[in-house]
Design a protein with these regions (language model features):
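Acidic/aromatic-lined carbohydrate-recognition and catalytic surfaces
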Residues: 2-175, 185, 189, 200-272, ...
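Conserved, mostly hydrophobic/aromatic
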Residues: 41, 58, 83, 180, ...
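Short acidic/polar active-site loop segments enriched in Thr and Asp
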Residues: 37-39, 193, 376
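Loop/helix patches that line or flank the sugar-binding groove of alpha-linked glycan CAZymes
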Residues: 283, 287-474
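C-terminal beta-sandwich/jelly-roll accessory domains of carbohydrate-active enzymes
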Residues: 470-489
């Protein structure tokens, strides 16, 4: 499957109108033809938590969202992207429930990772635990096996409860390979074009390592699942939050990767009034990436920016974002914090709010994203230039909900009337339709307070100039007659 070089939308199944049916209605009524690049529907499956990222099964769509028919209907107009949480399943899945009932005699016993699978005595030394890149304070959860009363400690990378509701799977086991094949086949049967391999960096569990992106084991798994996907006509997109060198290794092997570095670099440039660091980064990054500014989690810092930032600069950016209502996701592992104790994993907030609801700055940020080589993704809150929703974060106790507002159809229609949204829609159309973006990219020389980017393909030429002193951005492009046209962003 060939990924189209057009803008994609990221949305929850219920965030634009309430379900997949209303999502399709909103797309066709208000955004017709705008997202031919694809619609990334965040997990629409039955789930026990984490807003869909604790899947009970992939064979069904959660009834409150709709059916597979709704997914197919959306897919007839735009390629559909779905998530496959290759690292874990819900504790409420039939697979883990059978394991809790029958323990070692369960037909799914090899699917999960009890501590004894890595440490024969089942008791990992504290110094080895401290090596891990933790996403919760402890990487394990204790459960009682119903058949025997035995307490079993299983690997749970993610989860906000104790015990966790997200149970890691052993991707090298026969059961996992069989299930992943069945899940991917279900996706193919329903016309899914791209599968995002959520949290794939955490699938490698090996004693004496960080158990994150362990080489060469990670490549063996990726080769297997990419081969499976390709045979089914599906493209895979590994989701890996790691330092840039690790990401670039994936790119060198021909995988699509996420540009998790760009959001911070754009934010830093607009807040510090200099494009020097952003320009240096654009010159070194590989082009085969999905670009983003915002998503359902936050603006990545550690480990994504490791080796690319100074903590004193990052602290300034973080402090400004906090003043504008953001909250932070911390790094739990002391060994993986910055040398001076800097411990920000992600900045959580609406990108529009992080830029102080400044229309010009926000649209300049989007223009930079769209001119950066890669496939641009726009998160649904960002599409509507939405702001922080602190009440949602307070109500749920999940700081990420600050950027996960659910819009009714009436709200969508109201937000569409705002000039900033109309300007963004025009920018998306330009990015989708202008031929030069399939041509040659160039970073032009400029003073540090300006970013100057251009694309050229035959007679089609376009150039973006962003002045960080004023937050103003201007596109100059050649029309069908070759005449220059200025397009204020």
């Amino acid at each position: 499957m060939t990924v189209k070089n057009e803008v994609q939308l990221i949305t929850y199944p219920d965030s634009l109108g309430g379900n997949l049916g209303t999502l399709d209605h909103v797309l066709q009524t208000h955004f017709a033809g705008l997202f031919g690049g694809g619609i990334h529907i965040l997990p629409p499956f039955p789930s026990s938590g984490d807003r869909g990222f604790a899947p009970v099964t992939y064979f069904d769509i959660a009834p409150e969202f709709g059916t597979w028919e709704d997914v197919r209907r959306i897919g007839k107009k735009s390629p559909v992207l779905l998530d496959l949480m290759v690292n874990h399943l819900s504790a409420e899945s039939i697979y883990f429930r059978d394991y809790l009932k029958n323990g070692r005699t369960s037909e799914y016993a090899d699917l999960f990772i009890p501590a004894r699978k890595i440490w024969p005595d089942g008791d990992p030394p504290r110094d080895e635990i401290e090596q891990l890149f933790l996403r919760r304070r402890e990487p394990f959860s204790d459960f009682t096996i119903g058949e025997t009363g035995e307490t079993v400690r299983v690997w749970t990378t993610f989860g906000k409860t104790t015990p966790s509701g997200q149970i890691d799977i052993d991707v090298n086991s026969e059961s996992a390979r069989r299930l992943l094949t069945e899940f991917m086949t279900k996706f193919a049967e329903n016309g899914v074009s791209v599968v995002r391999l959520d949290a794939v960096g955490f699938v490698t569990k090996k004693r004496g390592t960080t158990c994150f992106f362990v080489e060469p084991e990670i490549y063996r798994f990726l080769e297997w699942i990419a081969g499976l996907a390709n045979a089914l006509g599906i493209e895979v997109l590994p989701e890996v939050h790691a330092d840039y060198a690790t990401q670039f290794k994936l790119a060198e092997r021909g995988y699509w990767i996420y540009d998790f570095i760009l959001p911070y670099m754009v934010l830093d440039a607009l807040l510090s009034r200099t494009g020097k660091r952003l320009r240096e980064y654009l010159a070194m990054r590989p082009p085969r990436q999905f670009t983003m500014l915002d998503c359902h989690d936050g603006v990545p810092i550690i480990p994504d920016l490791n080796g690319l930032y100074r903590s004193e600069d990052a602290r300034k950016v973080v402090d400004i974002c906090l003043q504008r209502g953001a909250n932070l996701s911390p790094v739990f592992s002391p060994r993986h914090k910055g040398p001076d104790g800097f411990d920000v994993h992600q900045i959580r907030g609406a990108f529009y709010s992080l830029l102080d609801r400044n229309d010009d700055a926000y649209l300049a940020a989007r223009a930079i994203q769209f001119f950066t080589p890669g496939v641009p993704q726009v998160y649904y809150v960002g599409l509507l230039a939405g702001g922080n929703d602190p009440s949602a974060a307070e109500r749920t106790g999940d700081g990420r909900e600050i950027n996960r507002h659910n819009y009714s159809i009436d709200e969508v229609e109201r937000e569409l009337q705002r000039p900033v949204v109309q300007r963004l829609l025009g920018l998306i159309r330009f990015r989708n339709e202008y031929d030069a973006f399939d041509g040659a990219f160039q970073i032009r020389d400029s003073e540090d307070s300006v970013l100057d980017l251009s694309w050229e393909r035959g007679r089609s030429q376009c150039r973006l100039r962003v002045d960080f002193r004023t937050d103003k951005a201007m596109i100059r492009y050649a029309d069908d007659d070759g005449k220059p046209v200025d397009l204020p962003v």
